[in-house]
Amino acid sequence: MLTVDCLFDVPRHQLKNYPNANMFVTKTAGIWVPISTADFLDAAMQVSKGLIALGVKAGDRVAVASNNRVEWNVLDIAVQQVGAILVPLYPNISESDYRFILNDAGVEICVVSNQELADKITHIRAEVPTLKYLFSFDQLPNCPHWSDIEANKGSVEQHEVEERMKAVKATDLATIIYTSGTTGNPKGVMLSHANILSTVAACIDPIPADKNSKVLSFLPVCHIYERMLHYLYMYIGCSIHFAESMDTIGDNIREVKPDVFSAVPRLIEKVFDKIMAKGEELSGIKKALFYWAVDVAEAYDVVGKSPFYKVKLGIARKLIFSKWQEALGGNVKAIASG
């Protein structure tokens, strides 16, 4: 059972129980740069103050269209702390989808990651009457930087944010996540703090990670699956490393050596197909050992196996599976897929 009621309590739980100097780690100019739990929470608090100064009220909608980056998570917590609702947007959808979602949700503030997305929102901004502010995580010549939110905080004090936080209930709406709209206009899925935290609670035990674990994040955090896992990782004190891009996942896995990462089933299928293709190229005793190990793996279950099976599994891990694990950084204990 979790000991928090709202999503913004999750990083505070980490600070109290597992303060982490490497809460989030981002590769910048070839160097992995961390942010600590304390600094993360301070950044979120300053943004919350700025949002209040901009007139954001409980229940207002703030949108974000961005790749995975620590600023996304800071904004997420900052928005929740003032009782507002985050509307995450995929960075690769059309202008017409942006227009529909921003209007449907009644978004007042939108934060994007780069010039391409700033241009998309700018093109349709006149058709979104509720949209008051547009900011960018990147420094752009024609769009205010998101640090302006904090800069506008004026005389807003921390106790004002804390009062907002106290007013938020577990059953309050935390986010509206829109479907892809492949069969019509996108549809908003309304999720409360309790909705998401119940999933976190259900997934904690199966994930073999703790405060000493490193995870790699590359699935879009705007999707509820990866976002839920971020809250889970934060709750148990993991270090979350962001992959540079989908093209660098292999390199980043070897650099970070994660204990856990999440992936979609199709990606795992591709990895499995490559492994099986390599096995088919073997001959003699090596090929026989390979397929024997595959048979052992297919009989695997987390509980209920005999001591004899555990001996076979230990041999298979030493002779065969250790090489597969090494290709995934050497420390992988689980790949979360759903």
For each predicted feature, which ranges?
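Structural core segment of the AMP-binding/adenylate-forming
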Residues: 54, 77, 81-150
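Conserved ATP-dependent adenylate/AMP-binding module captured primarily in the ANL superfamily
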Residues: 91-123, 199-216, 246-260, 326-327
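Conserved AMP-binding A3 loop
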Residues: 34-38, 174-200
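Conserved pre-ATP/AMP-binding loop-to-beta segment of ANL
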Residues: 19-22, 136, 155-178, 185, ...
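Conserved AMP-binding/adenylation subdomain of ANL enzymes
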Residues: 197-214, 221-321, 331
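A short helix-loop-beta submotif of the ANL/AMP-binding
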Residues: 61, 67-87, 91-95, 103-109, ...
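Conserved AMP-binding/adenylate-forming core of the ANL superfamily
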Residues: 23-77, 94-99, 147-154, 193
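ANL superfamily adenylate-forming
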Residues: 116-170, 275-323
